[in-house]
Regions:
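Beta-sheet-rich sandwich/jelly-roll-like modules and their strand-loop junctions
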Residues: 2-92, 105-114, 119-125, 134-210
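Surface-exposed loop/edge segments in extracytoplasmic proteins
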Residues: 94-102
Length: 213
């Protein structure tokens, strides 16, 4: 094979490399930059009690990747139509990072409901505190949330050992379990952040090889 043919082959290789790099980035899309994470939810054990205007529920949560996108909780209405607002705050120490409100009237009995955060909430230490209250609710017109201390497997229920900080607290009193909550978060991937640097390094390597033929 003569030099002319080699150079022609190198030009083709460079063109193919560029096309493949662009195609891989386009096909990979957001999956190159981050992955979505969901924690396992505890099985519903018992309701924590009516959440009235005199009630504050707190619990620590772990946010893998440090970016909170949403929560899924299990609520109950006591088989009645209630009104008011469930106020959900995400705190880092005394700092409120995010706040969302849930329309109590729209909640279904003994069912999951979702809370989305837009924009995504950045959690500095990958841990945060949930603070839940219902400032308008009174006894007989309030909802509740489920707590649990076990998790369902393929064959049976497995008890989960919870530390004190992992338990739910109602008005500062530790409850027998943690909130049945699924934490939705996002973890940034280094590959996506440095993809074009990696692609450029590969392109330069191919170009240098061709130059020294």
């Amino acid at each position: 094979m003569n030099i002319k043919s080699l150079k022609k082959g190198c030009c083709i290789a460079l063109a193919v490399y560029i096309v493949l790099a662009l195609a891989f980035y386009w096909i990979g899309g957001d999956q190159l930059h981050y992955r979505d994470v969901e924690t396992d939810m505890l099985s519903a054990g018992a309701p924590i009690g009516e959440i009235t205007k005199d009630t504050v529920i707190t619990q620590q949560i772990e946010v893998e990747g440090g970016q909170l996108t949403g929560l899924t909780l299990i609520g109950a209405t006591y088989a009645r139509q209630n009104t008011g607002t469930l106020k959900v705050e995400v705190l880092d120490g005394e700092t409120v990072l995010a706040e969302q409100s849930v329309d109590i009237a729209a909640m279904a009995d003994s069912s999951e409901f979702d809370i989305a955060f837009d924009p995504i909430v950045s959690i500095p230490s990958d841990k945060a505190e949930l603070k839940i209250a219902a400032p308008e609710s009174v006894e007989g017109n309030a909802v509740t949330l489920y707590v649990g201390n076990s998790m369902s497997t393929a064959r049976n229920q497995v008890e989960v050992n919870l530390s004190d900080e992992e338990h739910a607290y109602m008005n500062g009193v530790m409850q027998d379990g943690a909130l049945c909550v699924q934490v939705h978060s996002r973890e940034n991937l280094w590959f996506g952040a440095y993809y074009w640097y990696i692609a450029l390094a590969g392109l330069l390597a191919v170009a240098l090889y061709c130059m020294y033929l």
